[in-house]
Amino acid sequence: MRDTKTHGTASSRVTRLVVSVHDVASATAGQTRRWCADADSLGIPVSLLVIPGPWRGAALADEPGYAEVLRARAARGDELVLHGWTHRAGPEGSPPRRLLGRLVARGAAEFAALDEAQAADRLARGRAVLAELGLSVRGFTPPGWLASAATDRALARAGFHYTTSHFGVLDLRSGRMRRGFALSHRPGGTGERLGAATMERWARWNAGRGGLIRVALHPDDLARPGLRDATLRAIEAVLAAGGRAVTYSDVVPDTAGSR
């Protein structure tokens, strides 16, 4: 298993860096492989956010060979995280809530307006598929980082350890929030270049300040010129300042309150 990596000089306030690879599915195997290769070249672990249901093609259960790839990544020290079921928003919720999902998550806000029973059903289906393929998860990241309060209750009842939002990582057992804004791109959207520059500046500014920095990698980022390079510069800046690369499970310890 790969150790987490720290660069630069030691500090009493070490910044922790979580790099997450989103939208992991057989349909995005090539993009995931490329992001993982970048992480491997830096010697850092990643949190792989897996979509088990049908999305952009076959469901994970129909591609058991790809599950072997994920098992190999986990054996290297990466973490697998449940990332919704189908990654598509339904008709649930009020018009303002659905509009928010379209604007923020581009129609992927699957859990933004679910009630507890609906959320529990999708969580159970997703985890059952992963378990059948020999894959285990402790945490959940909702598509678009948008989830209803009922989803959080369903997660806690199902025994998940943590969930994430745009603003941090929530320990579902203690209720404690580890603050850390998720830095990500919006490929093809308004302000794409400004957003890329902001990611790099934010990472550099906060690299030596302690706390938590989160960098989110998406498959569609790789189709846009400059986004990959900006992302890698942001990650390298945190590592050069002494940041420690970890997975989400490292942020939320087994014993609540021990960190």
What are these regions (language model features)?
Residues 2, 11, 46-50, 212, ...:
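C-terminal domain-boundary segment and adjacent tail
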Residues 2-79, 132:
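Active-site beta->alpha N-cap acidic-glycine motif
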Residues 17-21, 46-48, 80-83, 137-140, ...:
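Hydrophobic faces of well-ordered beta-strands that scaffold small-molecule active sites
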Residues 79-97:
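Short, solvent-exposed beta-strand-terminating loops
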Residues 93-116:
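Active-site gating loops and adjacent loop-to-helix segments of metal-dependent hydrolytic enzymes
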